[in-house]
Amino acid sequence: MKLFKFLIILFFLNSCSFDNKTGIWNNENKISDDKQNQIFKDFKKISSSIKTFNENIPLKKNFKFNLDKSVNNVSWQDYYFDSNNNLKNFKYDNLNQVVLKSKKLSKYELNDYFLYNNNNVILNDLKGNLIVYSLTEKSIITKFNFYKKKYKKIKKLLNLIVEGDIIYVSDNIGYIYAYNYKINQIIWAKNYKIPFRSNLKLFSNQIVASNQNNDLFIFNKISGNLKKLIPSEETPINNSFINNIVLNENNIIFLNTFGSLYSVNKNNFNFNWFLNLNETLDLNISNLYIGSKVVCNKDKIFLSSKNNFYILQSKNGRVVAKKNFSSELRPIIYMDYIFLITKNNFLLAMNASNGKIIYSYDIKEKVADLFNFDKKKLEIKNFMLVNGNIYIFLKNGNVIQLDIRGEINQIIKLPSTLDSFPIIVDRLLLYLNKKNKLILLN
């Protein structure tokens, strides 16, 4: 019922823009059954099933990529690196020598994501422990647990973001809080009872989060007070996909578990536009929305739904390109190019303006042909741009290094398996292994 009412309201607000010219703000119109049906009709039109892309497209011999120099990154304060959820071309010494291997950081399962701030690695485990490991002292300098005994048996799924000495945390119990790890003190804490289910974003003095009911929250990051609550469609059941929040220059871009993408003005928190990317409104366990993280770059938005990859205009949500392939990994937008690994393991380079494919290669076939590599062992954890090359990190600890043209240079064997999403800071590669130890390579 909540979903039905919400869709009616959204139709009233005009599905692509929110102006004051039509009289809708003065209750001058009522929505008929035909118009209600049109809402559902439009939602279904947005995404249609097409045969999945499965084609090798070689790079034209005369094509030249325009690349900037790699950057020496010095911090990783956001799970997805920055407010745009986009990665850079990182500088890495590429010696692949172990600089540091920590002791076991926790006896409990650690989060796949961790942060880096002021020479400290910040991570958490399922017991709710916040752990700060100093690379200078080569030891844990802070270990803090916010939770009381009554939550002892609950697995705590925490979402972190750090700014200065403050770690901001939301969880699956309904708490959101700010913790100063330098003085070991809670700054503020609020309990909203409903589990939070999204990454966190910071801008100005605000912190943005979302819960499992697909409500979008904007808090004052100094006091923790709620500034704005924006409801959206609620899904009765959830899968592994969680709400995703990304910021561009003027707007909050919010993708919820119903498959709806919203643009919200950062200054007045009004809707700019919305778009539904789900393929069906029949929500059951077999057809729940699933897709990639959203990435913003310049005036475009990039993301995958279950079966399609989209390029959208950030100003109005207009579809610039829709492709018949999809990815669970977020794309990397670099210069004028998109780099993407599809669900069926094709590496693609595309034009970021129009989505035109520059090249497409079956990674499994390339690796198997060159290195007699078992295709079944090619389970991709993540990929990054490093020193102008493409590094594909496999779960078994191998790294496939390709040049920017999609040709394999080598396969690197890491000293241990990969159990987290790797990061690169200060020209070092950092990751957690399956024994909950931090590994640093130069």
Give names to the regions the model predicted:
Residues S134-K138, N180-N184, N220-G224, N265-F269, ...:
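Short loop/turn segments that connect beta-strands within beta-propeller blades
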Residues S416-N442:
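Blade-level signature of beta-propeller repeat domains, shared across WD40, Kelch, NHL, RCC1
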Residues Y334, L340-M350, K356, Y361-L402:
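Loop/turn-rich, solvent-exposed surfaces of beta-rich toroidal or solenoidal domains
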